[in-house]
Amino acid sequence: MTRGAWMCRQYDDGLKIWLAAPRENEKPFIDSERAQKWRLSLASLLFFTVLLSDHLWFCAEAKLTRARDKEQQQQQQQQQQRQQRQRQEQRQRQRQHEPSWPALLASMGEPSPAAQAHRLLSASPSPTLPPSLGGGGGGKGGRGTDSRGKPPLPGNSARPAWRLETCYPQGASSGQCFTVDSADAVCARNWSRGAAARGEQGQQTRGPPQPTPLWNLSDFYLSFCNSYTLWELFSGLSSPNTLNCSLDVVLKEGGEMTTCRQCVEAYQDYDHHAQEKYEEFESVLHKYLQSEEYSVKSCPEDCKIVYKAWLCSQYFEVAQLNCRKTIPCKQYCLEVQTRCPFILPDNDEVIYGGLSSFICTGLYETFLTNDEPECCDVRREAKPKSPSKGAGDRGGACPRTSLSASSAPRLGPSRLRLCVLVLMLLHTVLTASVAHNATALGVGGVHTLDERSASEE
């Protein structure tokens, strides 16, 4: 039975009775509005479902990333332990093949090697360290595991308390670099005046032959801040913790052993605190930097190198001499600010978006002058083999991509396809709703005209 205004005419008892065909839907326009509302509700539900799934997806990825980081950290710790054991075994093998300390002194021309070795072995234990930088605790509680308190190794007790390492930077006077481990061994030596006394030594060659000095302060470096020599520290940082640490304390023959030992231990204490701060920074960087692709110009290794240089320049405000190229030490603060990761905009904390995670404070209050200490430029030098003890290398070359750490997991190809699909579905639903609404309006107009014509008839 067709819909419309079809009429049939019947006569009953002389009365005209009009019988209209029954209609299936009395109000088609209301039904079209209801269907349109349902479509919009379904579209909104679909949109919010996609948003919720995206948020859940992001949470799941973050959880998987944290689990993967924990596994990598455990693997790195195990690898570091294996490497430490291998290094210890190699050192033990080297110690077995190395000559004894008295024989080495005798070969280098040191007078009375037995007496020197006896004085080195019979030295009194290290005294209590002075307070650390910034009002920290003394060395008795904080440096209990340091190598200064270690007993001499059995079977090799005459060996010096420092180890041979690679020169950093390669500017040592003798071509050999050492890392100081014991203050007693440092203060028991007869030192030369380094590069400052080479001219005097050259002038004295015409006179009677002078005994060649055995050691040079410019050949001995700190353990962590391995670009600072003892010569630079004694000549520039002459009063650590209110101590008198001038060059005369070390270079003067028959000088005070206790004062010299306290000065070297104070320098080692500063170096130890700088290493602790660096390890804290490295752990925070590894915790919050989920991806190494945070910049197109820098990488985490660049950030660590300049941060270490800035940190050491804050603990040791001295001018460095054995450098290929020098820059003002305060410039490293700006280098850290530009090379370390930035805080990117996020859904929760947009107010901090675009700010640097490291901000230099008080740098522009005092303008840079010629009196500022100069530090070694490590920005373009090769990365040192061991930037910190116990810190594992997590990568080689720097990544050179434009994605940042927080946007990388959100702008993957799968999520882009999902967003495009949702937009296409919403566009299709809205187009169908508009087309159906226009059709319903046209049918409703036809029904209205038919009803009016029937009423008139």
Swiss-Prot record:
Disulfide bonds join 187-260, 225-312, 245-260, 303-340, 323-376, 329-375, 333-360. Auxillary component of the NALCN sodium channel complex, a channel that regulates the resting membrane potential and controls neuronal excitability. Component of the NALCN channel complex. NALCN complex consists of NALCN and auxiliary subunits, UNC79, UNC80 and NACL1. These auxiliary subunits are essential for the NALCN channel function. Its main location: membrane. This is NALCN channel auxiliary factor 1. The chain crosses the membrane at residues 40-60, 418-438. Glycans are attached at residue 216. It comes from Bos taurus (Bovine). Keywords: Cell membrane, Disulfide bond, Glycoprotein, Membrane, Transmembrane, Transmembrane helix. Residues 133-142 have a biased composition (Gly residues). It is a multi-pass membrane protein. InterPro entries: NALCN_aux_factor_1/2. It is found in: Cell membrane. Residues 73-83 have a biased composition (Low complexity). One of its GO terms (biological process) is calcium ion import across plasma membrane. Residues 86-98 have a biased composition (Basic and acidic residues). It comes from the Eukaryota. Belongs to the NALF family. GO terms for cellular component: plasma membrane. The keyword Disulfide bond applies. Residues 70-98, 122-160, 381-409 are annotated as: Disordered. The keyword GTP-binding does not apply.
